């Protein structure tokens, strides 16, 4: 089983086709076949093995996580062929899917939202997605009270700030002027520039994930399979970054 898992990781990293899996992979020999690897990979996805492994690693290493500063951001994946939750995104010049990822202070992924179409902005169904991410963290027993949650100005809204406050965290979100010419009335919102700069560890994590070429372009129709496979990649990132 370990060799099969190594083959799956190799496929994800190189982006090769399944039938070409063993062209440059010498760690396994006959009677292995790419059909065997694909069979177990599909079986593990349907059984939720990757997702369970992701949560198991978070539970095992939760004391090593830097939960004092959390970071929320989204990442887009280009979509080829027909696929669920895929729409045109003008910045990427193509059809994309988007997923929200919550990382700790070092950039390790600790929570992942559902995949949504790429034509939506960052605030689309933000409360539902954020609640699901926080439920994942709670399930793993990760303590996040009194933490700073960094997010860019695309996430600046009252609903999200209230949701963060309800969980006894501090929303460190850059204010979005939204075409205002003057200063906003009322009490000035909390914002720590030094803590906010730490959120760029997300870019390192997303760059590492993008090094997995299978993830760079989505060819899988069912969004649940893709989400599970993404969790597998993030699980590896949590272990080896």
Where in the sequence are the language-model features?
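Short alpha-helical elements
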Residues: 1-241
């Amino acid at each position: 089983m370990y060799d099969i898992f190594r083959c799956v990781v190799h496929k994800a990293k190189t982006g090769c086709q399944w039938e070409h899996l063993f062209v440059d992979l010498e760690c396994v020999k006959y009677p292995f076949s790419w059909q065997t690897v694909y069979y177990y990979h599909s079986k593990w996805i349907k059984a939720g093995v990757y997702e369970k492994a992701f949560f198991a690693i978070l539970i095992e290493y939760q004391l090593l996580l830097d939960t004092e500063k959390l970071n929320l951001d989204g990442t887009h994946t280009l979509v080829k062929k027909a696929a669920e939750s895929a729409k045109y995104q003008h910045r990427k010049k193509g059809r994309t899917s988007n997923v929200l990822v919550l990382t700790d202070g070092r950039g390790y992924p600790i929570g992942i939202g559902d995949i949504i179409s790429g034509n939506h902005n960052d605030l689309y169904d933000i409360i539902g997605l954020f609640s699901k991410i926080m439920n994942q963290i709670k399930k793993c027993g990760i303590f996040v009270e009194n933490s700073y949650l960094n997010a860019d100005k695309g996430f600046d809204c009252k609903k999200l700030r209230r949701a963060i406050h309800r969980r006894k965290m501090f929303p460190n979100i850059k204010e979005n002027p939204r075409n205002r010419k003057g200063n906003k009335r009322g009490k000035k919102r909390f914002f720590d520039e030094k803590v906010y700069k730490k959120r760029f560890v997300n870019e390192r994590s997303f760059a590492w994930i993008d090094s997995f070429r299978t993830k760079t372009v989505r060819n899988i129709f069912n969004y649940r399979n893709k989400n599970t496979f993404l969790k597998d990649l993030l699980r590896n990132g949590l272990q080896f970054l």
